[in-house]
Amino acid sequence: MAGRKLALKTIDWVAFAEIIPQNQKAIASSLKSWNETLTSRLAALPENPPAIDWAYYKANVAKAGLVDDFEKKFNALKVPVPEDKYTAQVDAEEKEDVKSCAEWVSLSKARIVEYEKEMEKMKNLIPFDQMTIEDLNEAFPETKLDKKKYPYWPHQPIENL
């Protein structure tokens, strides 16, 4: 049992080392060594515990009913294994995270396309020292003064000054 569970719970330490900050490298190496220690201890355990030789104890224990009593109690003992109620929740959260990451990546790619268009527009601009006011207003419409809405100088709201 220990060997089968161990194969499922491996950690990709190279990927883990890439995502942790530089100031936490010592903590991560400590965690890795502790994990390796526990993994080796768990791997050393047999899959099933060794069987108890009750006949040997019955022959060598002086009190007659003591071994029979222990055997009955030992066979009646059932260690409850807690149910795993969090794995399904973690898997569901992982699926949601994958969806949100994919959505974020697609939105980021769209933003990158917009920013590349804007960069291309900036590269194709007339140099600022050669621009006229009309060229500036054409390239950047937000700089144009609105003389109809604000007929008095500075032709923009006081809050923007």
Curated annotation (Swiss-Prot):
Modified residues (N6-succinyllysine): K78, K85, K95, K144, K149
Function: Subunit d, of the mitochondrial membrane ATP synthase complex (F(1)F(0) ATP synthase or Complex V) that produces ATP from ADP in the presence of a proton gradient across the membrane which is generated by electron transport complexes of the respiratory chain. ATP synthase complex consist of a soluble F(1) head domain - the catalytic core - and a membrane F(1) domain - the membrane proton channel. These two domains are linked by a central stalk rotating inside the F(1) region and a stationary peripheral stalk.
Residue numbers carrying N-acetylalanine: A2
Sequence positions bearing N6-acetyllysine: K32, K63, K72, K78, K85, K95, K117, K144, K149
Source organism of this protein record: Homo sapiens
Gene (name only): ATP5PD
Protein name per UniProt: ATP synthase peripheral stalk subunit d, mitochondrial
InterPro entries named among the record's database cross-references: ATP_synth_F0_dsu_mt, ATP_synth_F0_dsu_sf_mt
One GO BP annotation of this record: proton motive force-driven mitochondrial ATP synthesis
Keywords, sorted A to Z: Acetylation, CF(0), Hydrogen ion transport, Ion transport, Membrane, Mitochondrion, Mitochondrion inner membrane, Transport
